[in-house]
A protein has these predicted regions:
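Glycine-rich phosphate/diphosphate-binding loop of Rossmann-like nucleotide-binding domains
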Residues: 4-24
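A short beta-strand-loop structural module common to alpha/beta enzyme folds
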Residues: 28-39
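Short active-site oxyanion
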Residues: 2-3, 58-61, 80-82
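Mid-chain, well-packed structural core segment of small domains
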Residues: 63-64, 69-109
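A general structural signal for well-ordered alpha-helical segments in protein cores
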Residues: 15, 42, 46, 71-72, ...
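C-terminal binding/interaction regions
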Residues: 4-6, 10, 89-145
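Short, structured active-site "lid" loops
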Residues: 45-63
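Alpha-helical structural signal in soluble globular domains
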Residues: 17, 21, 25, 52, ...
């Protein structure tokens, strides 16, 4: 599967907009929740996305909460996940190109739906450059708690 996507209640409406965009572009995805605006705990859904990516069940992931901060912190606790909180298109591009991020974090209270969909498009279509960046990503991946 290409993509796992999840959110808490604060990210639910933005996630719905992104799901429509994914369907319109025939992008295969797994929606791990949440499924309403009723209050839930963001780490649960960030972990579901992160584990799907780390296990190779999905090649990339998207996590959404109100700011994107909590879900990015939670996703990055899972080994093999490189989650980047992005607020603009340049960040979405460069986090793939130079950092090989495999999970995109979005803040629904920060980023509107049109910008978010453009960032998702860029994140999904941008390839990792490798080269000197691969060495740096390996250094990041080698850092242990």
């Amino acid at each position: 599967m290409e993509l796992a996507i999840g959110c808490d209640h604060g990210g639910y409406l933005l996630k719905q907009d992104i799901l429509i965009w994914l369907e319109e572009h025939d992008i295969d995805f797994e929606d791990v929740g949440c499924f309403s605006t009723e209050s839930v705990d963001y780490p649960v859904y960030a972990e579901k996305v992160a584990r799907a990516v780390a296990a190779g069940e999905c090649s990339k992931g998207i996590v959404i909460c109100t700011t994107g901060i909590g879900v990015s912190m939670a996703a990055n606790k899972v080994g093999g996940v490189r989650c980047a909180l992005c607020t603009d298109c340049l960040q979405a591009e460069m986090t793939r190109r130079h950092n090989d991020a495999n999970v995109l974090a979005l803040g629904a209270g920060i980023t509107g739906p049109n910008l978010a969909k453009r960032m998702v498009e860029i994140f999904l279509s941008t390839e990792f450059e490798g080269g000197r960046h691969a060495r740096r990503v390996a250094l990041v991946d080698s850092i242990q708690p």
